[in-house]
Regions:
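Short coil turns linking two alpha-helices in DNA-binding domains
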Residues: 37-40
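C-terminal regulatory/oligomerization modules of transcriptional regulators
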Residues: 95-161
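Conserved segment of winged-helix/HTH DNA-binding domains
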Residues: 70-95, 106-116
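Beta-hairpin "wing" of winged helix-turn-helix
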Residues: 52-67
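Short helix-capping/hinge SLiMs at alpha-helix to coil transitions
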Residues: 18-22, 68-69
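Alpha-helical residues within the helix-turn-helix
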Residues: 32, 49-50
Length: 161
């Protein structure tokens, strides 16, 4: 299970939109803010539109904006919109196939880890991120954002062009 750079950039773009839900943000501005090529930002936008997370408005004053409340978008939804289903191992994929299926002692381990990851990312919304709410902690040392001051904020802003 790997959270891709593309997903990281998507989350940063969405945080910019969530900071100001009325904001209409151009893909070009989003690309500049997260420091990615415009074409890459467009492909991210496409996945988010397809998932119903953002809407895209064309034209000179066009751009993208959140289609739903930030509190209604889970981190798992974003991950899966950008990179597809979250799977721990090929055997746990929706169409997973393994020659040892049914006889492998590791399948329950991978399936359990996958379920924990999905449930955890379903428990955190985009709204939680931008509002700096405390995340549910798997381990108490990760519950306190102040333990990670360099990651305390998204440093996101919607700028007018």
């Amino acid at each position: 299970m790997d959270i891709s750079r593309k997903t990281d950039y998507a989350l940063r773009m969405l945080a910019m939109l969530a900071e100001d839900p009325e904001c209409l943000l151009s893909v070009r501005t989003a690309a500049e803010e997260v420091n990615v090529p415009y074409s890459f930002a467009r492909s991210i936008q496409h996945g988010l539109v397809q998932a119903g997370i953002v809407e895209s408005l064309r034209g000179v004053h066009g751009g993208m904006r959140l289609k739903v409340s930030p509190d209604d978008v889970t981190i798992r939804q974003v991950v899966e919109a950008v990179q597809g289903p979250m799977v721990m191992n090929d055997c746990t994929a929706p169409d997973g196939d393994c020659a040892r299926m049914g006889a492998c002692c590791y399948h329950p381990l991978w399936a359990g880890a996958q379920a924990l990851m999905r449930d955890y990312l379903d428990s955190v919304s985009l709204g939680d991120i931008v509002a700096h709410r405390q995340f549910p902690a798997v381990d108490p040392k990760f519950a306190n954002r102040e333990a990670f001051p360099e990651y305390a904020t998204c440093a996101c802003a919607c700028r007018e062009e």
